[in-house]
A protein has these predicted regions:
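C-terminal glycine/acidic-rich active-site capping loop/insertion
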Residues: 92-173, 197
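Glycine-rich beta-alpha junction loops
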Residues: 3-8, 54-56, 82-84, 97, ...
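Glycine-rich phosphate/pyrophosphate-binding beta-alpha loops
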Residues: 32, 79-87
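Predominantly a Rossmann-like dinucleotide-binding segment in NAD(P)-dependent oxidoreductases
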Residues: 1-58, 192
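A short, glycine/Asx- and small/polar-enriched loop/turn
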Residues: 60-64
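Active-site beta-strand termini and strand-to-loop segments that position acidic
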Residues: 67-73, 93-96
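C-terminal capping/lid region of NAD(P)-dependent oxidoreductase domains
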Residues: 187-197
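A general structural signal for well-ordered alpha-helical segments in protein cores
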Residues: 34-35, 151-156, 182
């Protein structure tokens, strides 16, 4: 289960996010961030189910979604919304051998908001209390250090790809697959049924 939650009932000052039309709503704003993570980890699903709603007073676009990605051996739940006052884990993975819980995702956005520059070996490095925790049968919970986040490496790859010096880290097909999930989620929410991917 992946969450990208906020607590902010106010409308965005960016009107393209708040007016009905192509690319509007939370599915296009926060959705791609967790959809691409799920597809990167688990591949393309076989089916998609989604529930999207308008929860903020006066909103004209969906601002809450829950998507289920169906795989032969598992399901992956993706959620995002604006009314999560108490933080829930950003990542929860549960299986036969145990569970992995991570309370928050990458810290780079918070660091940028705090005015820090994306440079140096400590950039994107999490505090130990923010590491994920692995729980396994017969063992004590164990903190799992995260790799340092590095937005700049992504943009450097884009630059190098445009110059023909590297293959893109995110392919056109990756983007298309994320859009297929969004399209299936919108169709599912409208029809209230599971959609073939």
């Amino acid at each position: 289960e992946f969450h990208f939650d906020r607590y902010n009932g106010a409308k965005s000052p960016k009107m393209h996010k708040e007016l009905p039309g192509p690319g509007a709503g939370i599915i296009f704003d926060l959705g791609p961030h967790i959809i691409d993570q799920a597809l990167h980890l688990f591949g393309n699903p076989t089916h998609v189910f989604a529930d999207m709603r308008k929860t903020r007073p006066g909103t004209e676009v969906e601002d809450l979604f829950e998507i289920l990605l169906y795989y032969p051996e598992m399901r992956v739940r993706l959620k995002a919304g604006y009314y999560f006052k108490v933080p829930v884990p950003a990542f929860q993975l549960h299986g036969k051998l145990g569970s992995f819980i991570k309370t928050r995702s990458d810290r780079q956005e918070a660091d940028l908001d705090a005015g820090r520059k994306p440079q140096g070996d400590s950039w994107g490095q999490e505090n130990p209390q923010d590491y994920g925790v692995m729980h396994v049968d017969g063992g004590n919970p164990e903190r799992v250090p995260s790799e340092n986040g590095d937005f700049m490496a992504f943009y450097e790859n884009v630059f190098q790809s445009l110059r023909g010096e590297a293959q893109p880290a995110v392919s056109v097909l990756d983007g298309i697959n994320s859009m297929r999930v969004i399209d299936a989620a919108m169709e599912s929410s409208e029809a209230k049924k599971v959609i073939n991917y």
